Regions:
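A late C-terminal transmembrane helix in Major Facilitator Superfamily
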Residues: 334-373
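Extracytoplasmic gate region of multi-pass secondary transporters
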Residues: 221-263, 269
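Structural signature of the two symmetry-related core transmembrane helices
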Residues: 77-91, 286-301
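Helix-to-loop junctions at the C-terminal end of transmembrane segments
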Residues: 61-74, 272-284
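Intracellular juxtamembrane helix-capping segments at the cytosolic ends
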Residues: 116-129, 324-338
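Cytoplasmic helix-loop-helix junction between adjacent transmembrane helices
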Residues: 106-145
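Symmetry-related core transmembrane helices of the 12-TM Major Facilitator Superfamily/SLC fold
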Residues: 167-183, 377-395
Length: 403
């Protein structure tokens, strides 16, 4: 079914279990369709923390998991603890409805669970795959991530119609990942397995270091990936978080319609995820140029359109380009690090990315203070930032192979 380097093959169940790690990776956005209801339920509190607080705990947890995964603790053990905390912290607010503080504690537990698993999927892909197969699998992983996002958000949006706390029952879908965990493959270099050096294609990877450190190009690639993902989360997450408010402002529908828009956001990402390998190896660095320009156009649609159908198209474009840009960043990183460094490199990039998600709440408040408006200003800022990045990557080629 899927190639397991050039030395073996994963069973179908192992392949499915590996990809199932990605299913819950968009879990933080599950409550987005219900943000309007949550804002009404907690008018005197910073309701945005319900969505952004988990990312604060995702950051250190992701870094810790990346440092110990396969070295001191099995990948499977970390994944198990992560999915259990995902379920407990995700579902508990349905029952604990009296205190905003208790709700935030639950979201913190949930964030730790997400963080433990956040980097494992991409790290395992880089452990097992190289070249085009690696790009394909990164794309498939994002396909599953967005597939999970579609279902989590659709279920959450539908449940929100019964009450704000019903939204959190959508996290029960994480049980699918828990059931498949028993088949999750364990890398050969795991702490409990003999060490094997993976095959490294000439021209794409670099010799393994004597220590856990990276060479110069590896450090640059990790820093660039982390910066791009941080910036993407910082400027795009407020738009995703406010999508239900945007639809209400445009009189384009309630929580269910907003959930449909968010599902289109994820569904379009699924489509790109399926074809990512072919797109990336065809366009090379132009993947970034194309992605940033089209994302800016999608944001423009959300900022200026008024009809429900057109807003849906804008949401779909944003989702498509989000996956394209995120996966491109990881694919570029994979060309400059060794398989044994993948868990730490991915953890750093993912952790910094989620730090951008947490900072987005304060970034949104800052925009509100400066402009007096927090719904459309983030859209206009994203358009400007992405246009600048697209222009920069027309000049700078991160894929050039310097010695």
């Amino acid at each position: 079914m899927f190639v397991f380097t050039k030395k073996g093959v994963l069973s179908p169940l192992q392949s499915i279990s590996l990809l199932a790690i990605f299913f819950t990776s968009m879990g933080v956005a599950t409550v987005s369709p219900a943000m309007a209801k949550l804002a009404a339920q907690f008018p005197s509190n910073n309701y945005a923390l319900i969505s952004t607080l988990p990312t604060l705990f995702i950051v250190p947890t992701t870094l810790w998991a990346g440092a110990v995964a396969g070295k001191k603790i099995r990948y499977r053990t970390i994944s198990l603890v992560g999915i259990l905390l995902f379920l407990i912290g995700g579902i508990a607010p349905f029952f604990l409805t009296e205190s905003f503080t208790v709700l935030l504690v639950c979201r913190a537990v949930f964030g730790i669970g997400v963080g433990l698993r956040a980097s494992l999927g991409n790290a395992l892909v880089m452990q097992y795959y190289t070249g085009k197969e690696q790009a394909d699998m990164l794309g498939y992983g994002n396909l599953i991530s967005n597939f999970g996002g579609v279902h989590l958000q659709m279920v959450a949006g539908s449940l929100a119609e019964y009450g704000w706390n019903y939204t959190f029952l959508a996290h029960l879908l994480g049980l699918f990942s828990l059931l498949l965990l028993v088949f999750q493959p364990e890398p050969e270099e795991s702490c409990c397995a003999p060490t094997v050096t993976a095959e490294v294609p000439n021209g794409y990877r670099h010799s393994l270091l004597k220590s856990a450190g990276f060479d110069h190009r590896g450090r640059i690639a990790t820093a660039l990936t982390a910066f791009l993902l941080f910036l993407q989360q910082l400027v795009s997450y407020p738009i995703l978080m406010n999508i239900s408010l945007l639809f209400e402002h445009r009189h384009a529908g309630g929580a269910t319609v907003a959930a449909t828009a968010l599902s289109l956001y994820s569904a379009s990402g699924c489509l790109i995820g399926f074809f990512f390998g072919k797109i990336f190896y065809k366009l090379k660095r132009l993947t970034l140029v194309f992605g940033y320009f089209i994302a800016a156009a999608g944001a423009g649609i959300l900022g200026f359109a008024k009809q429900t159908e057109i807003l849906m198209i804008g949401s779909a474009i944003m989702g498509m380009t989000s996956v394209l840009l995120i996966t491109s960043a990881y694919a570029i990183l994979g060309m400059y690090i060794s398989p044994n460094q993948s868990s730490l490199a991915i953890a750093i990039a993912t952790g910094v990315s989620n730090l951008g998600g947490f900072a987005s709440a304060y970034y949104l408040n800052m925009l509100g203070i400066i402009t007096g408006e927090k719904l459309f200003t983030p859209i206009y800022v994203l358009m400007g930032v992405y246009t600048l990045l697209a222009t920069a990557f027309m000049v700078y080629d991160p894929l050039r192979k310097n010695s």
